[in-house]
């Protein structure tokens, strides 16, 4: 399968005119034979891309004390203190901006109830509720894992998109990223491959090329 995917990637990139910005490479996933009005049938999962998506995910961490220091040392893009959390709960505009700026959130478990109450509607709508960080858990390991993860969410729509890399990445690396996504979908969907109507690969502004 990898060779076929790689050929599709090469075709999608070669047929896309050069742009004045770094285009992402995206998958368009089309599902069928599955009732997405039932929440239990919807896709809401994560997959680690073996070669990342061309840039590390931006990670924000709700933490205090020693955990906050460890998160900063581990490369967290932003560490949110309890005081800042309180202010975000009082300013929805800033909360929405934060939700859009960062790809993933981590939170010490002690802050989860407050986050759910004050920021839940904003983060939840975007599929960005924080990953809980239990006491004594390794925040550095969690940050490292999230750097190359993509979230796969169908919601209630049969067609959805996933960024799997950048146009300037090697075609084989992109193919391996795509293969990881397809494998994860097959494992997640109720009837596996039978629920995949089609998968297309394309650059941000380029034509779509069928993968399966």
UniProtKB/Swiss-Prot annotation:
Presence of keyword Nucleus: no
Disulphide-bonded residues: none
UniProt entry tagged with the keyword Transferase: no
GO BP annotation list: regulation of translation; translation
Matching InterPro entries: Ribosomal_uL1 (IPR002143), Ribosomal_uL1-like (IPR023674), Ribosomal_uL1/biogenesis (IPR028364), Ribosomal_uL1_3-a/b-sand (IPR016095), Ribosomal_uL1_arc (IPR023669), Ribosomal_uL1_CS (IPR023673)
Molecular function GO labels: rRNA binding; structural constituent of ribosome; tRNA binding
Keywords on record: Repressor, Ribonucleoprotein, Ribosomal protein, RNA-binding, rRNA-binding, Translation regulation, tRNA-binding
CC annotations in GO: large ribosomal subunit
Matching HAMAP family: Ribosomal_uL1_A (MF_01318_A)
Subunit structure and binding partners: Part of the 50S ribosomal subunit.
Known function: Binds directly to 23S rRNA. Probably involved in E site tRNA release.
PANTHER family hit by this protein: 54S RIBOSOMAL PROTEIN L1, MITOCHONDRIAL (PTHR36427), LARGE RIBOSOMAL SUBUNIT PROTEIN UL1M (PTHR36427:SF3)
Family, similarity comment: Belongs to the universal ribosomal protein uL1 family.
Name of the protein in its database record: Large ribosomal subunit protein uL1
Organism, as annotated: Methanothrix thermoacetophila (strain DSM 6194 / JCM 14653 / NBRC 101360 / PT)
């Amino acid at each position: 399968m990898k060779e076929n995917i790689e050929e599709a990637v090469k075709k999608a990139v070669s047929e896309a005119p050069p742009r004045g910005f770094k285009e992402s490479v995206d998958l368009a996933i089309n599902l069928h034979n599955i009732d997405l009005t039932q929440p239990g049938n919807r896709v809401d999962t994560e997959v680690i891309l073996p070669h990342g998506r061309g840039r590390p995910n931006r990670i924000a961490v709700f933490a205090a004390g020693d955990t906050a220091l460890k998160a900063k040392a581990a490369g967290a893009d932003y560490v949110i203190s309890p005081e800042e959390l309180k202010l975000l709960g009082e300013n929805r505009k800033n909360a929405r901006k934060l939700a859009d700026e960062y790809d993933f959130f981590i939170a010490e478990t002690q802050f989860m109830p407050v986050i759910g109450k004050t920021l839940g509607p904003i983060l939840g709508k975007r599929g960005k509720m924080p990953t809980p960080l239990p006491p004594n858990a390794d925040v550095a390991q969690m940050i490292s894992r999230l750097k190359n993860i993509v979230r796969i969410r169908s919601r209630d729509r049969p067609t959805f998109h996933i960024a799997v890399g950048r146009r300037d990445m090697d075609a084989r690396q992109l193919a391996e990223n795509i293969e990881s996504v397809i494998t994860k979908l097959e494992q997640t969907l109720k009837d596996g491959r039978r629920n995949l109507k089609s998968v297309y690969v394309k650059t941000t502004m380029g034509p779509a090329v069928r993968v399966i």
